[in-house]
Amino acid sequence: MKRKALTRCAGALLLTAALALGGCGSAGAGGTVTNETAAEKTKQYVYQEEEVCFSDINLSNVYNIQYANGSLYMNGGRYEDDAAVLFYAVYDTEGNQLSYAELSFENGGETGISENIFAVGSGGDIYAVQTVTTNSGNEEDYSYNAVQRIVRRAMSDGSEIASADIAMDKNSAVGDYVNQILSDGKGNLVLITSQSVLIYDEELNLVKMLKAQNSIDNAVMLRDGSVAIVSWQDKGIAFQKLDLSNGQFSEAIVPENMEGYSFYAGIGYDLMTSSSDGVYGLNLADNSCVQLMNFVDSDLSVSSIYNLSAVSETEFYAQYYSDSDNSSHYSKFTKVKPEDVKTKITLTMGGIYIDSTLLSRVVSFNKESDDYRIKVTDYSVYNTDDDNTAAQTRMNADLIAGNIPDIIVSNADMPIDSYIGKGLFADLYPFMDGDNGIDRSRYLTNIFDAYAVDGKLYQLVTSFGVSTMVGKTSLVGENQGWSYEQFEQFAAGLGAETDVFSQATRGEVLNNFMQLSGGEFLDWNTQSCKFDTDSFKQFLAFLNTLPETINYDNISEQDWSELDAVYRNNRAALLMTYVSTFTDQKYLSQGQFGEPITFIGFPEESGNGSAISPSLVLAISSKSANQDAAWSFVKSFLEADYQDSVYNFPVSLDALEKKAADAMQPPYYYDVDGNKVEYNDTYYVGSVEIPIHPMTQEDVDQVMGLLTSLNQTLRIDSSLMNIVTEEAAAYFAGQKTADETAQIIQSRAKIYVEEQE
């Protein structure tokens, strides 16, 4: 069966940006090289994309795509009523469909048939693993079984040529099934389970059964005819080569800092793999791993690549999911010669665990700018299983040494106050008010001001949530905010039947209070500590009334059901929570508490004890030679397309008003035909279903009142937290008084603050 030829989507020559990090270990910190040398070096990682547009094929329905015998083979499926429809298709590299076949399997009741994995034989036939599953259909005595067989199919029409049941090792664990089938193109088929390797010939005769030395997580047929066995072990990803001729496994190879999860046969390299930042080549003989392609350099908004097939040392086909348009693509990628890549002025951006949304906007900026490109350094590659603080340590060392990216992606673990004190960040207010600025009156200026120091804004929050404490208005009153003294009086005044919190340990409360109102005891601007105050001593005394641990194993199902209703029944008064959308208010008031609530916040002598918990914070280096260009990128996060798209609270008033209006409407979704369908919202308290109604204007006003009153920021300083918890432990154990403990914490904290200068 022939179908019309495929069309090719327009490819784009992609330019330069990020310094290679990740995948197979770090290649060095981005801040330690100049922008000029970085621009030249990253030209090595640029690939041109030429998208293949498959007519009449929805890539979301495709299971596998393989390059074999000069053609592209794929299979996929969809469900129609009680039938599973499987298809196989073949295309040539020019985009013409060579064959297409559909098979229908009746799937219903207790039986299901699937055929998701396949390999291409030496003659072009398909060898698939078919799985037939059955279940007892009895909910009280449920059982499940799966039987697998190899099916040889003619590629022209999908017809079955032959089949054979798969011979499993009798000693294999129950549930050990074939999850991969490979072909060496020379008559050998290799079936992979989690414990065994089964070798068949193309006539479906079992030739050899091998027991793996370790659990098998992945396997790849290499170009030399051997099989790379991949296992995830305690020390990392381990590789072994299996010689099919003699059934011998090589010694295990464990590369350092290997981050790839899917591996494919390479050309010029044993294996190719994709990481969050690009594609890498790996040779097992010398344990070498090098970056081949960088996604950002190549103007690709993608977090991973799969179904990769190498066709030469400089070309490969692969499928990827685009973060920019939320759809799947299949493309041919060809390496661009470094001398053919246009040189632009390079802006550097550094952060830890830079997410796909941010990278997508970097790609958009790089495409749209004629003069600038952003180079991304994600320091998270320095983290290991043994040290998850290595990234923060390395980035901090670079910044302190003066190797500062033009754009900094901030996080709560950074010693931001110290950076500001050293003059590392630029004031953003002049940019906001300049020719390429914004109308500040259309934003939550209190959010900006909360991050300002002495009238200067060094960090820009683009969206946020609120960490706060909530109670019934009937218990805590209507006003937001209270002091430590008021909090202590409230806690002491509760009856014996009402706990302050539900199921909260002293460690949880201490951690939350220090993050959300710890600024009460430490002022980085003045380098002053106030841990020896009566407020802090009273807080220690309150913490001592809370349990150190909670044994959740002793909580019965009935107790769990009652815990759902503790706030409704006044068995607990305060909830430490996180609010990120308008609708969170209705679930709290109508659902969890069952009556009007107040965002009372954490105790804070100087203001509202609810804290801004930012989703994304950006800063610009005061040392940057390209601050205007950096601001152009940062400013894009304040524009409508971004502000309207964020899930949690935007800083734009226009975007907030849209979200508020939506919250006052019934919830809805769009069906498969694109029709808007409204539905009734509910909340469960135990097994009781509670109807949740759309928010009223009064509800929306309450949330807006919370947002416009925020003036505290979430603070996380692990070193300071360690000082407090270490010394407080002696007080909780009865070894020191509150006065002694407060004095020791005050002394240690003061020394710590002074050392940060």
How would you label these PLM feature ranges?
Residues K375-Y443, D564-V566, R571-L574, Q590-Q592:
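Extracytoplasmic "Venus flytrap"/periplasmic binding protein-like
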Residues Y429-R442, G519-A541, G601-A611, G734:
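Short, solvent-exposed loop/beta-turn-alpha elements that line the ligand-binding surface or hinge
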